[in-house]
Design a protein with these regions (language model features):
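Glycine-aromatic micro-motifs
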Residues: 1-153
């Protein structure tokens, strides 16, 4: 069965959601995207996490091994190709202590850059905050993303 690595930085860091959305997916561990910034953009339906290139920044991610069927489910959920597009990105993998332990390439969904900055609803921000807590990610990255987005709304 063909699989690929998927890099999740938004609501797909929620284990319960991923279990339902992508039953064949397996969590491989945590990592980060160096040279990327987390922010929020959206449309009339709401605001969601996305990433953009920025030197000196990094975004924590979960690495999932997904099947072709899981990827189709993610495509529907992410609004691919109209809302998000797919991009291969190199991630630094980290161990439980947060130390670098390797590099791997994976697929991430990136929102089209033309989308407007917009703050997410409280439930969405809370979902990401819980994921950051669960995996020991720096909550300051999430706070900074919200502040950066607010400045650009």
């Amino acid at each position: 069965m063909e699989t690929k690595i998927y890099l999740a930085y938004g609501s797909n860091m929620d284990l319960a959601q991923m279990k339902v959305r992508c039953p064949g997916a397996r969590l491989l561990g945590a990592g980060r995207l160096d040279g990327w910034r987390l922010l929020f953009k959206g449309s009339r339906t709401g605001a969601y996490a996305t990433i953009e290139r920025e030197a000196g920044k990094h975004v924590p991610v979960l690495l999932w091994r997904v099947t072709a069927e899981d990827e189709k489910s993610l495509d529907r959920y992410e609004g691919f190709p109209d809302f998000y597009y797919k991009r291969q990105i190199q991630a630094v993998t980290v161990n439980a202590a947060g130390r670098d332990c390797g590099r791997t390439r994976g697929m991430a969904y990136v929102m089209h850059e033309k989308r407007r900055f917009c703050l997410p609803q409280g439930w969405y921000a809370a979902l990401l905050e819980r994921a950051y807590e669960n995996f020991g990610f720096e909550k300051e990255i999430l706070r900074e993303a919200l502040a950066y987005t607010a400045e650009h709304c």
